[in-house]
C-alpha cells in the first residue's frame, strides 16, 4: 500500500518536471530562432530595399565624355562633389553689360552701393581678390543654348527650374551685349552675343576684342549644338581662337536631341578638333530635361573644367 501511494505521489511530480524541462528547451529553441531571425531581417530587408530602388538611367552619349577626353585625367567623385557644392550654393550677381570693349568697367564694384558693402566686408584683401577674379567666356552661334547653359551651371543639378539668371529666349540672337556674372566672388562668367544669323558687326567686334585684349580671360568655352552640323562660321571661330592662342574648350549642347551617335562621332572626328595641338577638352551636355535625358547630364563635368581653368581646383 505504501509503495502504491509512492507511485501515485512521485509519478505526477516526475511528469511535471519532464514537462517543465521540455518547455524550457522549447522556449530556448524558440528564443534562439527568433534571435536568429532578427539578425537576418535587417540584411534581407535592406537587400530588398536596395533592389527595389530604381536605377538611374544614363544616356548613351554620356560615355563619350570619357572617350573624347582620354588624354585628360578623369576628375574624382570628391572633386566633382566639391565643385557642385560650390556652384549650388554660390551667390550669383549680374555685374555689367557692354556693347563695346571700352564699355567694360575696370572696377564694376566701385560704382554700386552693394558692391561697396562687399568690399567693406572683405577689407583690403577682399578688394584685391575681387578685382583679379578669373573670367571665362561662353561663345557660340545664335540660339545654341548659351544662356541655358549658364543657368544650368549656376543652379542646383537636380532642379528642373532653371531660374532667370540669364534670360532664356527662343528668339535667335537674344543676347545683344557682353553680360558679366560674378559667381561667389571666385570667378566671372561672360555671356557673349551669338554669332551668325541676326548678329551684327558690332557684336562680333566686341567679342573678338574681348578675346584678344581681356587680361582676366582664362578660358573660352565654344558651344556647338550636338544635333547640328559644324558650319563654316563655327570653323572660322575655331581657327581664329586657335591661331591667336586663346585657350578654349568645346561644349556640345542639346545632346539629348542627337538621334545617331555614330554619325555624331564621325562628325567630331572629321572636324579636326581632335587633331589640334592644344587638344581642347570636349564636354557633352543636355541643357534641358526630356524623356531621354531626365537630368542635366554633363553639367558637373563642365563645372569642374571651369573651376580647373580658373585655377580653383586644389
Swiss-Prot record:
Entry protein name: MIOREX complex component 8
Major localisation: mitochondrion
Domain of life (superkingdom): Eukaryota
Pfam family of the protein (one): MMR_HSR1
Keywords: GTP-binding, Magnesium, Metal-binding, Mitochondrion, Nucleotide-binding, Ubl conjugation
Binding-site list for GTP: 140-147, 173-177, 191-194, 253-256, 290-292
Quaternary assembly: Associates with the mitochondrial ribosome.
Protein's organism: Saccharomyces cerevisiae (strain ATCC 204508 / S288c) (Baker's yeast)
PROSITE patterns reported in the protein's UniProt record: G_ENGB
InterPro entries referenced in this protein's UniProt entry, alphabetically: EngB_GTPase, G_ENGB_dom, GTP-bd, P-loop_NTPase
Residue positions binding Mg(2+): 147, 175
Cofactor: Mg(2+)
Amino acid at each position: 500500500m505504501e509503495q502504491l501511494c509512492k507511485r501515485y505521489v512521485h509519478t505526477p511530480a516526475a511528469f511535471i518536471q519532464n514537462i517543465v524541462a521540455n518547455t524550457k528547451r522549447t522556449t530556448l529553441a524558440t528564443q534562439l530562432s527568433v534571435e536568429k531571425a532578427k539578425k537576418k531581417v535587417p540584411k534581407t530587408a535592406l537587400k530588398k530595399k536596395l533592389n527595389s530602388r530604381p536605377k538611374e538611367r544614363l544616356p548613351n552619349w554620356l560615355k563619350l565624355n570619357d572617350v573624347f577626353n582620354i588624354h585628360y585625367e578623369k576628375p574624382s567623385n570628391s572633386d566633382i562633389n566639391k565643385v557642385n557644392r560650390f556652384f549650388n550654393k554660390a551667390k550669383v550677381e549680374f555685374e555689367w553689360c557692354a556693347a563695346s570693349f571700352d564699355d567694360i568697367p575696370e572696377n564694376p564694384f566701385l560704382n554700386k552701393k552693394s558692391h561697396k558693402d562687399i568690399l567693406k566686408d572683405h577689407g583690403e584683401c577682399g578688394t584685391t581678390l575681387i578685382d583679379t577674379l578669373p573670367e571665362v567666356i561662353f561663345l557660340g552661334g545664335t540660339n545654341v543654348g548659351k544662356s541655358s547653359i549658364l543657368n544650368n551651371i549656376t543652379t542646383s543639378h537636380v532642379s528642373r527650374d532653371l531660374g532667370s539668371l540669364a534670360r532664356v529666349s527662343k528668339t535667335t540672337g537674344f543676347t545683344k551685349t557682353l553680360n558679366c556674372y560674378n559667381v561667389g566672388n571666385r570667378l566671372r562668367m561672360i555671356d557673349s552675343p551669338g554669332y551668325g544669323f541676326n548678329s551684327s558687326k558690332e557684336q562680333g567686334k566686341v567679342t573678338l576684342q574681348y578675346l584678344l585684349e581681356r587680361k582676366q580671360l582664362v578660358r573660352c568655352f565654344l558651344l556647338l549644338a550636338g544635333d547640328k552640323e559644324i558650319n563654316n562660321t563655327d570653323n572660322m571661330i575655331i581657327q581664329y581662337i586657335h591661331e591667336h592662342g586663346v585657350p578654349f574648350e568645346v561644349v556640345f549642347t542639346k545632346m539629348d536631341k542627337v538621334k545617331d551617335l555614330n554619325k555624331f562621332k564621325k562628325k567630331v572626328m572629321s572636324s579636326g578638333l581632335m587633331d589640334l595641338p592644344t587638344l581642347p577638352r570636349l564636354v557633352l551636355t543636355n541643357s534641358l530635361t526630356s524623356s531621354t535625358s531626365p537630368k542635366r547630364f554633363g553639367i558637373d563635368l563642365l563645372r569642374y573644367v571651369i573651376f580647373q581653368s580658373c585655377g580653383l581646383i586644389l
